[in-house]
Amino acid sequence: MRQKIVAGNWKMNGQIQQVTELVSQIEELIGFDCAAQVAVMPPSIYIPKVRDCLRTGKIVVGAQNVYPKDYGAYTGELSAPMLKDFDCRYVLVGHSERRQFFHEDENFVAQKFHHVKDHGMIPVLCVGETLSERENGKTEQVIAQQVLAVSAKGKDCFRDCVVAYEPVWAIGTGKTATPEQAQKIHQFIRDLVGEINDSDAKHLTLIYGGSVNENNAKALFSMPDIDGGLVGGASLNAKQFVEIVKCIN
């Protein structure tokens, strides 16, 4: 079901005091009728603590990563059943930093995507192009490859999931795609999914990630195919994050 979502990806930031204070501040500041589903994705070791700090039901917890097996000799990894034990609703898969630093390819990302779905959580599939790929006119080619990699399991694979367009050149750089640039790619993704399953395309939640902040969020969220944001650095500041959430209204 298509819905408005703002998710904060805290990446590898925070220790227990900071994490506890941050989630409490966010929850306190969201003292209004929120039009968006709000999620926070802390470092995995703090997921239980964040879950236990949530009091009002205004925020849900998500995970930044998962390994696509239920159990086994995979030292240091976490499975979807483990994340589900701590009430994770959303799980990032295919984030550009995982692709870049951990060499995760399309097949592995697809395995993660379906592993999350198979266990009743919502995968947030991250797709996006590098600056070089954009300058060489390969944006749509790259994104199509990333999106279609998860479609091998059948026509309903995009049901009950989220796709996040995160242009790699805009992540952590302070650069942001213009609302029109972002809308063009979001529409391209929706049309691409529509070629697989028109109904799922209409109900697909598409969010934008790439230096989203309180100054550009309103213009981005006003675009017809942008349903919210995947927020990085700004989600580590409670006031800034909540200002972004308010831009959904």
From Swiss-Prot:
PROSITE patterns, alphabetized: TIM_1, TIM_2
Isomerase as UniProt keyword: yes
Positions with a binding annotation for substrate: N9, W10, K11, G172, S211, G232, G233
List of catalytic residues: H95, E166
Molecular function GO terms recorded: triose-phosphate isomerase activity
Keywords of this entry: Cytoplasm, Gluconeogenesis, Glycolysis, Isomerase
Pfam families per record: TIM (PF00121)
Enzyme class: isomerase
Alphabetical GO biological process terms: gluconeogenesis; glyceraldehyde-3-phosphate biosynthetic process; glycerol catabolic process; glycolytic process
Cytoplasm keyword on record: yes
Its job: Involved in the gluconeogenesis. Catalyzes stereospecifically the conversion of dihydroxyacetone phosphate (DHAP) to D-glyceraldehyde-3-phosphate (G3P).
Name assigned to this protein: Triosephosphate isomerase
Encoding gene (name): tpiA
